[in-house]
């Protein structure tokens, strides 16, 4: 079986190498304004990820409609085995590594694997890590997350290292949709330094300044979801801050 990096992941890596950071917009397929959000973000995001934590009923239709609106990569971010459609370009094939329930860290992805293969979807291997205050959000509740305390950033860094040893190429530090506060800069910094894995950071990022800080600290991808649902016009400023931080980060490396 060919486990080489696929087309979508290659494109993302090329942008990351050139621009220093990526901006993903998360769309919940059950939100009524999903088409409006897709229209607003199509000129600013690097990819659209589609997913939700609670029952999805119209994923095929939503994905088709979003792909009519934009040429951006449409990547699935499945909350369960029903979060997969052949209409997408790729799927974040993930393990919720710090769930208390083995269903979420192993059984669910295993049950979904054959469907992903039959659909011909590109699988992007990713560790999904629930960070404080995720227990107060839907994904924390549904996923039975043993959340990683913000004051213990070294725990997150070791999970990221473990993920890289398992062969995962991406790790998502998730504070949860609508979180009170985002993943700390320190946690991002030491997780990136120890593991070298591509870091996705989301949850509680409400301003361009905060997004800038996260990228400078080591985030490779910033995800916004609730923000763009409530204020789709905010994506332009978010993109500008993320890309500015990416350029500054690249300069600091040289």
Curated annotation (Swiss-Prot):
Pathway recorded for this protein: Membrane lipid metabolism; glycerophospholipid metabolism
Organism of derivation: Methanococcus vannielii (strain ATCC 35089 / DSM 1224 / JCM 13029 / OCM 148 / SB)
Known catalytic reactions: sn-glycerol 1-phosphate + (2E,6E,10E)-geranylgeranyl diphosphate = sn-3-O-(geranylgeranyl)glycerol 1-phosphate + diphosphate
Family to which this protein belongs: Belongs to the GGGP/HepGP synthase family. Group II subfamily.
Keywords: Cytoplasm, Lipid biosynthesis, Lipid metabolism, Magnesium, Metal-binding, Phospholipid biosynthesis, Phospholipid metabolism, Transferase
Function of the protein: Prenyltransferase that catalyzes the transfer of the geranylgeranyl moiety of geranylgeranyl diphosphate (GGPP) to the C3 hydroxyl of sn-glycerol-1-phosphate (G1P). This reaction is the first ether-bond-formation step in the biosynthesis of archaeal membrane lipids.
Cofactor: Mg(2+)
Protein's UniProt name: Geranylgeranylglyceryl phosphate synthase
Main location: cytoplasm
Pfam families: PcrB (PF01884)
EC identifiers of the protein: 2.5.1.41
Highest taxon in the source lineage: Archaea
Cellular compartment(s): Cytoplasm
InterPro entries: GGGP/HepGP_synthase_sf, GGGP_HepGP_synthase, GGGP_synth, IGPS_HisA/HisF
GO molecular function: imidazoleglycerol-phosphate synthase activity; magnesium ion binding; phosphoglycerol geranylgeranyltransferase activity
Residues the record lists as binding Mg(2+): 28, 53
One of the record's GO cellular component terms: cytoplasm
Binding site for sn-glycerol 1-phosphate: 172-178, 203-204, 225-226
Gene3D superfamilies tied to this protein: FMN-linked oxidoreductases
């Amino acid at each position: 079986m060919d486990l080489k990096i696929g087309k979508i992941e290659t494109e993302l890596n090329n942008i990351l190498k050139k621009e220093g950071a990526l901006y993903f917009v998360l769309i919940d397929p059950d939100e009524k304004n999903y088409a409006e959000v897709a229209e607003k973000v199509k000129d600013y995001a690097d990819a659209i990820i589609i997913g939700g934590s609670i029952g999805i009923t119209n994923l095929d239709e939503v994905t088709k409609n979003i792909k009519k609106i934009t040429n951006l990569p449409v990547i699935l971010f499945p909350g369960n085995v029903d979060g997969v459609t052949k209409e997408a370009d790729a799927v974040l094939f993930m393990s919720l590594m710090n769930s208390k329930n083995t269903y979420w860290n192993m059984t669910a992805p295993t049950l979904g694997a054959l469907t992903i293969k039959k659909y011909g979807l590109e699988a992007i291997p990713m560790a999904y890590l629930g960070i404080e205050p995720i227990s107060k959000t839907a994904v924390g509740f549904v996923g039975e997350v043993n959340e990683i305390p913000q004051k213990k950033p070294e725990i997150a860094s070791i999970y990221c290292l473990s993920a890289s040893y398992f062969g995962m190429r991406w790790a998502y530090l998730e504070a949860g949709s609508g979180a009170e506060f985002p993943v700390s800069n320190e946690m991002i910094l030491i997780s990136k330094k120890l593991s070298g894995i591509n870091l996705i950071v989301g949850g509680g990022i409400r301003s361009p300044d905060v997004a800038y800080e996260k990228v400078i600290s080591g985030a490779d991808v910033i995800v916004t979801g609730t923000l763009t649902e409530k204020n789709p016009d905010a994506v332009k400023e978010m993109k500008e801050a993320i890309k500015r931080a990416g350029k500054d980060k690249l300069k600091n490396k040289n």
